[in-house]
């Protein structure tokens, strides 16, 4: 492989990193009768010249399941429930000037089995065509969307198969287990340092730290550079939030440049990290191109950080809203906890596919070129798939959630790493901060697809008696 080029060669870089989370990661469901302003029952849905007779759900007029203003306030669990009950696969109209795709809307898929079917049928439902991201900035140039096809999650077979085979070498059970001791020590240190402050923002002091350290360890990022990488990743996912003073495109260029620099250094001095593994990878005569490597580092740095930290934050919020489960966790530490946290949190609300041909899904005709949005946040509360889905239950054994992106070729590459991080950080919190409590409501990220929390103020209340059980 030749030397890696300067990142300035990629002039139209992905706008704000909006194509992330193959590594992958509020309010709860409530009665649908709380809805006001209803859409009339038309009985006919139009899309790309298609007429399909389907049931019409009772939704607020003009409701858009990718509207970042909705998610800045809440997760629309009531609307999800209405879809599952009335129209599990429903055409959501959207003006062409909204979201960057210049079409007239998209299908929303709300039930677990239908979401899994879309995920499995990668020969029919493409991530490459319009990427997996459900909503971009309204004025994004088409070439910026197409640039995101370098990212693993936005590739179809056979390119996706080749790349996934290459990069999965860095996520073997052996590779993940090799991080356990280091991450255990990090988790303890993070929690103890937070405790010393007495009170503060759980997101920045606790939830952000362990995912950052885990990804940095995998990449071999020096300690002095880790906060810089963290800041870049934040900028690349906060593009839809006006409260954040960021430059997503500049951050994209910075992290690409950093990736190329790392690769050049490892070529000269190989190390025991994923960077060396990837730049030396050669399977069936193929290797990562410079662009593929750079965008994989973006995926790893951003998705591996953002989704897991939001899962941890939502997990802490769930425990504090359900104190019986926190007491149970402190005593039992069930291994089922991490997956229930991921189900409950659903760090990525939705991803999309695009139909490559006319097809059928759940009795609904989908036309070639139409987008299909998988509502993970709805599927994970499907009454037909989960017993008492509205209950946060860390002992839940039957838990076929899609918090790691469903099934099939794009199942979360870093799922086991995320589970490990969640397990380690909550063990440390239970040991050292068993009486933690919230001081205010969380501040949500404005995003059409990420279930992000920007701030969550807590009182750490350091325990005097220590953990109630021994480990």
Swiss-Prot record:
Pfam families according to UniProt: p450
**Keywords of this protein's UniProt record, alphabetized?**
Cholesterol metabolism, Heme, Iron, Lipid degradation, Lipid metabolism, Metal-binding, Monooxygenase, NAD, Oxidoreductase, Steroid metabolism, Sterol metabolism
Q: How is this protein named in the record?
A: Steroid C26-monooxygenase
Question: Which family does the record assign?
Answer: Belongs to the cytochrome P450 family.
Record-linked InterPro entries: Cyt_P450, Cyt_P450_B, Cyt_P450_sf
**Organism of origin:** Rhodococcus jostii (strain RHA1)
Q: What is its EC number?
A: 1.14.15.29
* A GO term for molecular function: iron ion binding
Annotated GO biological processes are: cholesterol catabolic process
Q: Kindly indicate where the leader peptide sits in this chain.
A: none
Q: Which reaction does it catalyse?
A: cholest-4-en-3-one + 6 reduced [2Fe-2S]-[ferredoxin] + 3 O2 + 5 H(+) = (25S)-3-oxocholest-4-en-26-oate + 6 oxidized [2Fe-2S]-[ferredoxin] + 4 H2O
Statement: the UniProt record of this protein carries the keyword Oxidoreductase: yes
List residues binding heme.
412
Q: What happens when the gene is disrupted?
A: Cells lacking this gene fail to grow in the presence of cholesterol.
* Keyword field contains Transferase: no
- Name the gene for this chain: cyp125
């Amino acid at each position: 492989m030749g030397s890696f080029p300067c990142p300035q060669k990629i002039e139209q870089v992905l706008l704000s990193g909006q194509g992330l989370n193959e590594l992958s990661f509020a309010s709860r469901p409530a009665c649908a009768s709380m809805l006001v302003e209803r859409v009339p029952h038309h009985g006919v849905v139009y899309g790309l010249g298609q007429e399909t007779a389907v049931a019409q759900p009772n939704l607020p007029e003009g409701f858009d399941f990718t509207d970042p203003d909705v998610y800045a306030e809440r997760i629309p669990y009531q609307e999800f429930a209405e879809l599952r009950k009335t129209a599990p696969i429903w055409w959501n109209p959207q003006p062409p000037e909204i979201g960057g795709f210049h079409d007239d809307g998209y299908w929303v898929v709300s039930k677990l089995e239908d979401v899994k079917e879309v995920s499995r049928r990668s020969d029919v439902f493409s991530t490459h065509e319009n990427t997996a991201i459900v909503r971009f900035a309204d004025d994004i140039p088409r070439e910026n969307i197409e640039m995101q096809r370098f990212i693993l999650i936005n590739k179809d077979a056979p390119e996706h198969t080749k790349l996934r085979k290459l990069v999965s070498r860095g996520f073997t059970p052996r590779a993940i287990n090799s991080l356990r001791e280091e991450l255990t020590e990090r988790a303890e240190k993070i929690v103890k340092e937070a405790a010393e402050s007495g009170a503060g923002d759980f997101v920045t002091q606790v939830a952000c730290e362990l995912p950052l350290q885990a990804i940095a360890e995998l990449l071999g990022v020096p300690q002095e550079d880790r906060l810089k990488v963290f800041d870049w990743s934040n900028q690349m996912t906060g593009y839809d939030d006006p409260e954040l003073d960021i430059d997503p495109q500049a951050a994209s260029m910075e992290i690409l440049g950093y990736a190329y620099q790392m690769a050049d250094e490892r070529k000269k001095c190989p190390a025991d990290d994923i960077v060396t593994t990837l730049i030396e990878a050669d399977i069936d005569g193929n290797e990562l191109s410079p662009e593929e490597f750079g965008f994989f580092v973006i995926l790893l740095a951003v998705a591996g950080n953002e989704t897991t930290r939001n899962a941890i934050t939502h997990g802490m919020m769930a425990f504090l809203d359900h104190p019986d489960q926190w007491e149970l966790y402190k005593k039992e530490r069930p291994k089922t906890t991490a997956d229930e946290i991921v189900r409950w949190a659903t760090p990525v609300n939705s991803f999309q596919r695009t139909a490559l041909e006319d097809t059928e899904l759940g009795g609904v005709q989908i036309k070639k070129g139409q987008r299909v949005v998988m509502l993970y946040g709805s599927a994970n509360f499907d009454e037909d798939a989960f017993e008492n889905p509205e209950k946060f239950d860390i002992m839940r054994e039957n838990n076929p959630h899609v918090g790691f992106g469903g099934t099939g070729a794009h199942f979360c590459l870093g799922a086991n790493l995320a589970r490990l991080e969640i397990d380690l950080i909550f063990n440390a919190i239970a040991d050292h901060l068993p009486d933690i409590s919230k001081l205010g409501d969380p501040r949500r990220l404005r995003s059409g697809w990420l279930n992000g929390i920007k701030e969550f103020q807590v009182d750490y209340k350091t325990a005097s008696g220590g953990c109630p059980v021994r480990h």
